[in-house]
């Protein structure tokens, strides 16, 4: 998949399949974009390491965590909140769960390693204000993020926690998408990927 170096609209309704390449196994390199609002970048040179990563497995009844070097997180039922830098690997299947990167948290790498995650009330993944996050799709894996019609602020049946997108990047968030696996995004609410500003595309193949 290739993105030209031009503004790229990711405010997508319906189904979206994202296949990106370019993550290699070493330390995370930084891509930045200066904007008051959230920015999503697809990149060819963002790198990550699984060494010392903290791993989570989602199920319909909860989230289990395997020991790793990074403990900046909290779990409440099927909701995972990350509040400190580190590498976090997520897998499993959950019909109503979520992942939130807490506002102002930088240098987070979130590795999708065979994750099927649906949220019935909000965005399955929320990158809070002024966060710095690399979302890496692990090679050889199929991953699916989905929401429901209740995740639409414009709907009369909207959830109180609605974000109107499956992947929400709030103001000031810098989010890099990369990886050679497959990410399927199914938006029943409104948008597939939404940030607070026009998204910038970088070539990814």
Which residues fall in each region the model found?
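A composition-driven surface/loop motif
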Residues: 2-205
């Amino acid at each position: 998949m290739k993105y030209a170096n031009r503004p790229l609209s990711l405010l997508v309704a319906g189904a979206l399949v994202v296949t990106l390449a370019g993550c290699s196994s070493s330390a995370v390199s930084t891509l930045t974009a200066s904007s008051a609002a959230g920015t999503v970048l697809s990149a060819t040179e963002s790198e990550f390491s699984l060494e010392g990563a903290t791993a989570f497995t989602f199920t319909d009844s909860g989230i289990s965590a395997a020991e790793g070097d990074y403990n900046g997180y909290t779990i409440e039922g099927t909701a995972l909140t990350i509040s400190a830098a580190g590498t976090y690997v997520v897998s499993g299947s959950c019909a109503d769960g979520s992942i939130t990167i807490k506002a102002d948290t930088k240098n987070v790498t979130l590795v999708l390693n065979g994750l099927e995650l649906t949220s019935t009330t909000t965005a399955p993944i929320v990158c809070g204000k002024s966060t710095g996050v690399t979302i890496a799709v692990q090679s050889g894996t199929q991953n699916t993020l989905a929401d429901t019609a209740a995740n639409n602020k414009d709907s009369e049946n909207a959830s109180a926690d609605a974000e109107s997108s499956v992947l929400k990047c709030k103001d000031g968030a810098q989010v890099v998408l990369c990886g050679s696996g497959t990410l399927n995004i199914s938006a029943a609410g409104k948008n597939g990927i939404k940030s607070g500003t026009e998204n910038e595309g970088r070539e990814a193949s």
